[in-house]
Every structure is written in C-alpha cells, then in structure tokens.
Amino acid sequence: MITQRQNDILNLIVELFTQTHEPVGSKALQRTIDSSSATIRNDMAKLEKLGLLEKAHTSSGRMPSPAGFKYFVEHSLRLDSIDEQDIYHVIKTFDFEAFKLEDMLQKASHILAEMTGYTSVILDVEPARQRLTGFDVVQLSNHDALAVMTLDESKPVTVQFAIPRNFLTRDLIAFKAIVEERLLDSSVIDIHYKLRTEIPQIVQKYFVTTDNVLQLFDYVFSELFLETVFVAGKVNSLTYSDLSTYQFLDNEQQVAISLRQSLKEGEMASVQVADSQEAALADVSVLTHKFLIPYRGFGLLSLIGPIDMDYRRSVSLVNIIGKVLAAKLGDYYRYLNSNHYEVH
C-alpha cells in the first residue's frame, strides 16, 4: 500500500507522461507536490521498488510502468468522467442524416478513432438477447429467394438462398409457416435451441425428405447468431502494437467475444491495462463502455490503445460519444415508431 503523497506523485507522473511522453523529474513534480525535492525523489524511489515506476535510459526522470498505469486506473481513474471541452465537437460531428442504425454505429466508431488516434470497436446488442419479430420469404426467381427477418421490430436481416431442387411453391409456404408458428417472437438464443430440438420433429410433418429443409433452416438463421461489429482505426494499431493485434482485428467475431469478456456481469464500464485473456490484446489497454440502444438493450463501445494512453481524456471521450450516440439513437427509434406524416 502506498501513502497519499506517493499516490499523488504517481498520479501526477501518469498525467504528465501521457501528455508529453517524456520522463518526469522531481523538479517538475515540485510545482504541484508540496514537498522538498529530496522527499519527492525518495518517494519516487519507493514507487520504483514497488514496480510502479521505471527509470528512463536517457534521463534521471521516471515514467509509469505497466503496473503503475494499472494502479492508477484501479485507484484514481473515474470511469464516469467527462471533459466538457470535447462535448461540442462530438455533437457537431454527429450532426448528419442517418438512414439506418448501422450508419450511426459506424459514425461513432470513426469519431472515437479519429479523436484518439487509436482503434475503436462498436458492437450492436448481443445477438442472443435480440428477438425475431418479423419474417417473410420473397421468391426472386424460379431458383432463388430472399428471407427477410426483423429483429426487435426495427433491425432488418436479409439472407438470399438457392431454393432446394425438390422444393415446390407450397414448400416455401410451409417453410415460412413453420417459422411463424415456432420461431416468431422468440429470442435468438431460443431459436438456436429450437433448431436443434423442435424444428426437426415439426419438419417431418410437412416434408417427406427433411435433410435439405433442415440445412435451409440452419443456413437462413445462421446470420442471426453473428455479432454486428464496427471497427475503425485498424491501421492505428500498428503505431502502438505489433502485427498480431492488426491481424486479430480482422476476425470481428473473435474481437466481439474478447470485448464482451472484458466486462464482468453487471458492469457498465471497465478498463483493462495489459490484462486481456486474448494474446493479441495482452500488451494494450482496452476501455469498454455499455451504451443504451433504446427499446432493444445495450451496445458496446470499446477503445483499444497503448498502455501509456491519456486515460482521463480517453475515458471522457468514450463517455461523451456513448451518451451522444444513445441520444441520437433515441431520436432515431422515436422517429421509427411515430406517424411518418404527422406535423412537427
């Protein structure tokens, strides 16, 4: 355990170092810490012995170690902090016409990446928590059709498929009827379960040959189990990490799994400092924040960057963008649920 003065010294070194990326000496600390230079140097030496500070090779100053950054995050960083200077810029950047949910999520991801110079990832509501609220099949030709699904009464998912060779028009109608009877208004996780239990038994009542029918069910509904992921600033990862992080960001489904694991049950925000279970993220910091998607649940806003990032500003930007995004989404869903022709 460190003393209050040592904690103040560590916090100030973290603040100065993340702004300048230069080692911090006792003289720079004396302007804020009300103690002699010798006392400050003694405390810095103790912090170094504890592994919270490191010596610079080219200077007598000190800089935070990964353990020092982690201590700062766990003991001094407020995860709900907001810097009012950035609010106007974020609101102004969000002033655009969005035609669908994905436009706003992608925009938010780009804004965060551009304002930090790091990598931003945004996830839609977790697939398992969404519900199938609409389903239709549109025959495009004699040989292919389009399954049109609606999740949470607002999110469309379309899957084009080749009509099985032995299918007649009545078979497509039966396929749609089974979905409406057994899967409509079910959660995605329940659909996954029913496809393995109920549906094989039901299909036998409607079809003589069931193999290609069950394959069709699996193909059409497999899209629902995938995370909707928006990555921005991927190239930025090369400036603060190695190629493994850059390549990992290509696997969006695995990225989504890792980010969801970074939040404990019931947590709204977290900061991991070189603490991810994923090897490609083991030497970086990951800030994760839940934001409200009205009527549907929570999305995830994450920032991936270097261990020596400016945590106060990064947390502030994540909070601001999360709040502005939630407000924009609220307006968007209110518009979808309103009478399009009403006079405002």
Swiss-Prot record:
Keywords: Repressor, Stress response, Transcription, Transcription regulation. The keyword ATP-binding does not apply. GO terms for molecular function: DNA binding. One of its GO terms (biological process) is negative regulation of DNA-templated transcription. Coiled coil: none annotated. Transmembrane segments: none annotated. Negative regulator of class I heat shock genes (grpE-dnaK-dnaJ and groELS operons). Prevents heat-shock induction of these operons. Belongs to the HrcA family. This is Heat-inducible transcription repressor HrcA. It comes from Streptococcus pyogenes serotype M5 (strain Manfredo).
